[in-house]
Amino acid sequence: MVLTRREMLAMLAAAPAAPVALAAQASQLPLNTSGLEHVGFTVPDPQKSAAFYGRIFDPQIFQEMKPPLRYYCRLGIGYVAFGPNATATPRIDHFCATVEGYRLDEMRAELATRSIRLTGSPDFNALTDPDGIRMQFMTTPGGLLPTIIASTRVTQDDAICEAVGLDHVIVQVPDLEKSAAFYRTFFGKETARERGPERIWFTAARTRLGLEQVATGQMPHIDRFGIRVAAFNRREVIRKLEGAGVTLLPATGEKLLRFRDVDGFTVEVRGI
């Protein structure tokens, strides 16, 4: 087969681009994420904390098969996880994003070229941002691991709200622009900025990650999170939450509720 001059030039022009195209295809950054899936807590009494959420979102709570016992409450396609520390101040210790076609070893190597250290195994791997906030990755569809079993049903009543999944996670940091630069690596360009208070939003599928300025004298931390729920009667849900002893917080709009959980964290519930 004899190639024309035009065909030869076309082949030569395409050849150097092939490795570049393959490298671009292999990159996992920004993440092809299906969203923020769960948040994890360190609390004095994990069973009590899980039971609190269970009464509101899913009465059947779960636990690890073996000690140290972590407890879980499902939130539709997401969940909240509670690990024990009897003497530590309660804190939200990590949040997790699920990733389509996640390849751990390749991600670890790719992040190493950016001086970001990803540690752990396929079951639990995570990195920390410049302020020590921990972010975990799991392969889509995520969910509870095989080591987790049904624990107990905390009430015979129906759930007060029908959870769909996480809605957002709010991280408070000392330098918004520095943190935004870090999270662009994983979620791409921010999708919104707000004033009063200043807030930067990143979109992760149907969920969002928000950055806020941490208060003077406080350490950087995961401050609060939101849960998407099926459409609800606000007045009826408020009545049931108050009947369950839940402390409600001010909120505006018929589709938004805010409350304080048993460990003092603010939870925001948004109807869809």
Task: Describe every region a protein language model picked out.
Residues 59-93, 101, 134-142, 188-223, ...:
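Conserved short beta-strand elements that form part of the metal-binding/catalytic scaffold
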Residues 1, 6, 18-20, 31-37, ...:
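Residue-level marker of intrinsically disordered, low-complexity segments enriched
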Residues 4, 67, 100-103, 125, ...:
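Alpha-helix initiation/capping motif
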Residues 103-107, 233-237:
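Short, conserved charged micro-motifs
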Residues 2, 31-32, 41-80, 126, ...:
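Core segments of cupin and vicinal oxygen chelate
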Residues 2-29, 108-165, 171, 193, ...:
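Vicinal oxygen chelate
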Residues 22-50, 92-97, 142-180, 222-229:
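N-terminal beta-strand motif that seeds the catalytic metal site of vicinal oxygen chelate
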Residues 25-27, 32, 68, 81, ...:
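Residue-level detector of functional hotspots within protein domains
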